[in-house]
Each structure stands twice: as structure tokens, then as C-alpha cells.
């Protein structure tokens, strides 16, 4: 690679967030390139030349046609790929859901695949990422916003655009498949694609610009592979108005603990003295704190000098507590208001053997035939569906309750669990022993808490979306170690509900023909 092209890619990676958003119709060219978002140069995976991947936007009701073009060449980060559009229900388009070996075979290098899906009734803050092994940790991850022209919160803010999306990224100097199976911490935290590591104390930091007197809707997106972050902005309170694509009753906080894959919209009133203020995202482990500007970005008021802040952090007195979150509009909780008061209740027992995680004594090993293809080919029962012990058929039009008790047998807690194809009611949250069947928040990623707190997080949802849907820990290193199951929802109706395009059917024969070095 010539020096000119090399510099071009590095420069691109540093200005990722200055590029225009794409969508709802777009091509995403997935490639390998050297990048240095924290001042340390490494090969990574870029989309349309940038890390993090570009912001995708659209409006409620849009049809998204996202053509993924795989030009990957570096086998250490895998040459194939598969992209999940996180938080979208994909009703009728389970084939476009993205998880490799659950909903599709990966896209081979040198090939492309069109993800074509509607978003009829969702709006809010989402994201997208590779769903093949630990590939998203190497760069294939970015924000996705669906705007609501009739947003019920519109009167609460003045500005909501590309400049008010905030991404939090754990960044590693070693490719995920070449590093430890379970890393002991990231090398840097990137906020909007920029950050510092211990070895790069002069790297550029992201600047978030505001104008005094205006109210901003910031969309905070954790595109983390592992740590959760405690997010705050010196001198400012934050009013949370959206949780994982669900409008919520306004809640005033001064810090937000955000777990991998979660999203929050908050309104910030730029009513403080014109100046520079530290934006902080402290990981729960690894290189913590803010010495030398690590884990930080800058909130800069118009008219403030171009300088690093001198503000200090004050102790959080009104942190975000999940049980204080409630939907803006009433969302009835499925089932009756007693523990187990549903059509089907499942308890998930976690375990770990030093190498792999287990749920109810099974570790998830990706099958050679995607679960969706198994169902379309006639497999119907848990006995028929692979991987054995990891696929749970769920009846149609039923209420489901899942309990996820925290246990010392599954280290690395708190584990954030994500259910595909649904938002669920969090009827018991981490840190709480009470059950709320009246007005709990609905979301798609929930912290399962810690064994020390005796947590027994409980969620509920309705089976109204035929297809195989992943439920997994969103710490990507844990998912890769088998911390997942699949719900095969309403198996009998999957085929009729999800007609698949020929291009989807072609993915497996192409992928299966690859040598291991080309996968």
C-alpha cells in the first residue's frame, strides 16, 4: 500500500464523525485499513473508509435498503461478515436480521448482500454491527437513528441531528482474534471515534459543540464489545427521554451507567457559563479514571477558547436507576401480575467452565446450517433444531417470562443480555427485589446484575414475531464463548411470515465453498 493511500485511510478514520449520514438507501463497503483513532496505528475494519462505521439515518416508516459490499482481505479479522441492525424487530424479514448461523450464512469476501427491511412503527436510537464471532470489536460498528416526524418529545429540545449522536467504543490495539479470549480491559475509550490510551497522551479528543441557551437531544449509543460506562458531563444534568428505541417519561439524572449495546436519549440544556466541560465515560474495568484526558471528550460552548477543560467532576447524586424509568405512553405488561403469571416461563441457569459459558448446561456452538434455514427445511422441534440444547421453541401468541439469575458461576458480571426481534418489559431490574407489572420500562438490552446483590432480573414479552431470535450476552467475548440461546418463535408460521430472497438462499452455498483461510 502506497504512503499516499495509507495516509488517506488514517485521515479518514480520524474524521469519521464529520462525514454525512447515509441511508435509508446506501451501500456499506466493508474493508480492511490502517486506522489510528487513539493515535496508535493498527489494521482494522472500516465501513466506507471510517471507524466507527458511518451514521445511518431514516424516518419512521422508511424502507431501508442497505447493500453490504464485502472487500475484506485480512483473515485475522475474518474475511466474511454479517451485519445485525440492532433493535429493529424485522417482522417478516427475519432473514435480514443478521446474526451469522442463526439468521443467515456470512457474506463472503468479494460478494455483496442487500439487507432490505421496513421500519413501520419504530423510531429512536439504534445501532448496527457485525454479528460474526468477535468481528465488531475490530471496527464494524456504528450508530443508526430513526427520526419520528411526530416525536412526542419534540417540544423538549431545539437540536437533534448528526452532531448530537454520541458513540462510546472500547478500542483495542490488538485484533480480537489475536488477543486474549477474555481481554482484561480496552486500550482506549473512544467517544465519537476519538480518544487517548496510556501510550498516546496527546491524541486528539472529540469535541461536542453547543450554543448557549439551546437544548440538545443527545443520543448516547454504547457500541461497546465489553465494558459498561458511567457517562456524565461536568456541570450539567441530563434528562433521559428514550431508552433503546422506547420513549420514556422524562427523568433527570447526573450520570448514566450504560451497558454494552444500550442506548439513551437525553436532553442537555446548554445553560451554563460559556466554556469547556469534560465529557466522561469511565469503564467499569481496565484503564479507568481520567488522567491525561483518557475516557474523555470535550463539551465546548460557542465562544469558548479552543482549549482542554479545567472542570472537575462532582459526585453523582442522581444517577440513572432503571426502576425509575417508565414508558411515556402506557405499554401493558404481558401476562398476569404475579411471578410466573405467563403462558411459558423459563429460568436460565448460567455457568462457565473456564473456556465456555453455558445456559441450562448448553454452550452455544454456531451450527453449520443457520437456524432459519433449518426451520425452512422442515425442522420443527427442539430435538430437531441445532445446536442441541440451545434452541427453545416458543408458542405463537403467548406471554413469555424469562428469569436471568446472577451467579458467581458466570464470571464477568454484570452481563448485559439482548433479545432480538422484540422489546421486553423489565419487570424486575438489577439492584431491585421488587416486581413491577404496572409501568416498567421496555427495552432490548438489560443488565442482569451481580450475584452479590442477589439479582434475579426478569423480563417479559409477547410472541408476535415468527422466526428464530437470538438471546445472548452482549459482551462479545462472552457471546463468542457460547453465552447464548435461540428462541424459535412460532415455528409453524416462520416460512409463511418470512419469504426469503434468492440472494439469501445463495449465501450458504457460497460460504460453504470457501476454504477456512477465506472465511
Curated annotation (Swiss-Prot):
One of its GO terms (cellular component) is extracellular region. Binds 4 Cu cations per monomer. Its EC number is 1.10.3.2. InterPro entries: Cu-oxidase-like_N, Cu-oxidase_2nd, Cu-oxidase_C, Cu-oxidase_fam, Cu_oxidase_CS, Cupredoxin. Residues 22-147, 159-301, 368-490 form the Plastocyanin-like domain. Keywords: Copper, Disulfide bond, Glycoprotein, Lignin degradation, Metal-binding, Oxidoreductase, Repeat, Secreted, Signal. GO terms for molecular function: copper ion binding; hydroquinone:oxygen oxidoreductase activity. Cu cation 4 binds at residues 415, 473, 478. It catalyses: 4 hydroquinone + O2 = 4 benzosemiquinone + 2 H2O. Cu cation 1 binds at residues 84, 418. The keyword Hydrolase does not apply. Residues 1-20 form the signal peptide. It is an enzyme of class 1 (oxidoreductase). PROSITE patterns: MULTICOPPER_OXIDASE1 (PS00079). Its cofactor is Cu cation. This is Laccase-2. It comes from Trametes villosa. The gene is LCC2.
